[in-house]
């Protein structure tokens, strides 16, 4: 194989198109002399990271989006024609190829990771080599973890094809144990070789993954595998490509403890300052947070153990995914023009996906009435003057919206009375924030990183694995809540409250074995469809039946099954009976 870009041959397997992510310098270097310098290594590994942002360009097809809308604490929402949002909540489909872009993007990342892993041994600097190798192994583990949680059995590819003929042979689906064994091996090696530096002293630059990321991800993988599949330990792949060992809870607990004690990560003092609505520009006009510390900016946040970096580089012609498109999708649907958004300040315009279930609010209030995180996490639009139900034909509306990942506005002009006259669609376009050079586009101007794993999650995972209350009570103490004795109920509630709307709930209810019950609990909730009051009802076969039929796994794109000539097998529960036609009123 002569050129690094020859990895495109393997991408034939997954109908990938990566040209805009590849650079001229890639095509001019061969695997015989590349990478050599630290700059080369960073460039190669940056190509792996780039696929994270590529998937955000079609965020509605990602595992994170599914994890939010399929779980019990949010509905699908969107407008009456946004069926792809509503089907996620009801575990139905409109297009059997819905997740093609996500499948392609994740395998694109895996292919790039495989190429990097095969060539990073050429980097002379041992510290940099180990860091880059550890980052790449962790990224590959993350890609496979999302795929296996979303689709179940998928092809496991960990080497680079040596010729086009080899690349064109579609690999069969691997067993669940083989996939998890490979994930475990990648994370174990990453933890062993990556420098144990304070998160602020990253070897390769801000936003890169660390030893601590690998330890945290190992905890997440272990909890899902052992919980969902009823196992005691995580299988471990040997050097010969066969399962030859395992990782038990003691080793995982030790890894999480290492992250807690030695990473330098910690909790910020005020939960509100984790979220962009406490930024210095918006904060001065938002009474709820006037006494809160300023937003802890991306790259400076001690709770960010793993975050996908976004930036102002997003553009329609090239890199849409550098914009955090979740903030657009999860924002409040067109609401009667700028005057109405002033009343909803500082929360801006978007597509109305993921209205919050009223049962989350009620159950949270009943279980923890003095928890300030509830108001810090949820906007009650019904208490806002002039709130419009049914704006732009919003479906499955509850009047409740999450406040963590949402378009966030700022005042542009003030009237003679000091009130807001006009708004910036995003606070990041204010000259008081990023300067005069920023373009204003309500769909693209979302330059906030996507948190994947927060330090609070690490504390809660450690409590769950060790069945001790220390980590859980540290999280509660930050919220001003009293300590509690460890129990399964207390731990599950704490995860639900602390990590609400951060992409963890779907995996949690699946691995705890409560998904059918939790999903059915949505029935009877008060909602509005196009402004008309009704209640949440079963669609298709219904929540419980659909989960029982699918176990929460999504359909493999039919185009991939066809491309494989039947080597790939479709997941159960995704025949024509699961097609969503229209909302059952």
What are these regions (language model features)?
Residues 3-4, 9-39, 141, 183, ...:
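Bacterial Sec-dependent N-terminal signal peptides
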Residues 17-18, 106-109, 182-184, 205-206, ...:
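Long, intrinsically disordered, low-complexity segments
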Residues 37-56, 79-151, 167-203, 422-450, ...:
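Conserved, well-structured interaction surfaces
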Residues 160-165, 258, 474-481:
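Short edge-strand/loop segments of extracellular domains
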Residues 355-453:
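Flexible, polar/acidic helix-loop-strand segments at domain edges
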Residues 148-149, 155, 198, 221-233, ...:
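Short coil/turn linking the two alpha-helices of tandem helical-hairpin repeats
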């Amino acid at each position: 194989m002569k050129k690094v870009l020859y990895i495109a041959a393997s991408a034939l397997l997954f109908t990938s198109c990566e040209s805009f992510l590849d650079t001229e310098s890639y095509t001019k270097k061969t695997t015989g002399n590349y990478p050599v310098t630290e700059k080369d290594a960073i460039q190669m590994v940056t190509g792996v990271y780039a696929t994270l942002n590529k998937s955000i360009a079609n965020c509605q097809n990602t595992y994170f989006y599914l994890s939010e809308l399929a779980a019990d604490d949010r509905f699908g929402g969107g407008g009456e024609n946004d069926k792809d949002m509503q089907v996620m909540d009801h575990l139905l489909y409109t297009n059997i190829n819905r997740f093609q872009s996500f499948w392609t993007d994740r395998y694109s990342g895996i292919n790039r990771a495989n190429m990097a892993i095969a060539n990073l041994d050429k980097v002379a600097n041992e510290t940099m080599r180990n860091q880059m190798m550890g980052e790449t192994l962790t990224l590959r583990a993350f890609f496979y973890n999302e795929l296996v949680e979303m689709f179940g059995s998928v092809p496991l590819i960990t080497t680079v094809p040596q010729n086009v003929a080899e690349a064109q042979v579609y690999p069969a689906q691997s067993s669940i144990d083989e996939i998890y064994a490979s994930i475990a091996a990648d994370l174990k090696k990453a933890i062993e070789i990556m420098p144990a530096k304070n998160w602020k002293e990253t070897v390769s630059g801000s936003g890169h993954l660390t030893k601590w990321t690998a330890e945290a991800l190992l905890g997440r993988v272990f909890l899902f595998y052992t919980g969902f599949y009823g196992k005691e330990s995580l299988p471990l792949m040997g050097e010969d490509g066969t399962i030859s060992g395992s990782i038990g809870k003691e080793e995982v607990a030790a890894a999480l403890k290492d992250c807690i004690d030695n990473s330098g990560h910690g909790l910020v003092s005020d939960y509100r300052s984790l979220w962009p609505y406490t930024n210095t520009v918006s904060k001065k006009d938002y009474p709820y947070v006037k006494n809160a510390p300023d937003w802890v900016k991306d790259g400076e946040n001690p709770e960010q153990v793993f975050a996908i970096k976004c930036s102002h580089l997003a553009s329609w012609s090239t890199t849409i995914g550098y914009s955090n498109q979740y903030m657009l999708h999860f924002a409040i649907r067109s609401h009667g023009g700028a005057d109405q958004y002033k009343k909803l300040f500082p929360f801006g315009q978007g597509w109305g996906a993921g209205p919050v279930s009223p049962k989350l609010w009620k159950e949270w209030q009943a279980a923890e009435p003095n928890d300030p995180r509830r108001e810090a996490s949820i906007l009650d639009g019904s208490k806002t003057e002039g709130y419009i139900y049914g704006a732009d034909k919003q479906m499955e509306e509850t009047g409740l919206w999450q406040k963590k990942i949402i378009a966030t506005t700022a005042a542009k002009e003030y009237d003679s009375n000091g009130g807001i006259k006009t708004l910036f669609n995003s606070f990041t376009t204010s000259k008081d924030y990023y300067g005069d050079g920023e373009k204003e586009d309500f769909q693209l101007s979302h330059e906030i990183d996507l948190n994947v794993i927060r330090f609070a999650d690490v504390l809660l995972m450690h409590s769950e694995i060790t069945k001790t209350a220390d980590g859980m009570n540290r999280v509660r103490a930050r919220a001003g809540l009293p300590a509690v004795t460890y129990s399964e109920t207390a731990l599950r509630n704490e995860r639900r409250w602390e990590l609400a709307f951060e992409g963890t709930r779907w995996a949690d209810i699946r691995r705890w074995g409560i998904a059918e019950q939790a999903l059915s609990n949505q029935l009877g909730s008060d909602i509005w469809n196009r402004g008309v009051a009704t209640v949440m009802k079963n669609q298709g076969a219904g929540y419980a039946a659909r989960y029982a039929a699918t176990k929460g796994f999504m359909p493999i794109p039919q185009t991939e099954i066809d491309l494989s000539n039947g080597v790939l097998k479709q997941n159960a529960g995704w025949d024509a009976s699961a097609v969503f036609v229209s909302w059952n009123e």
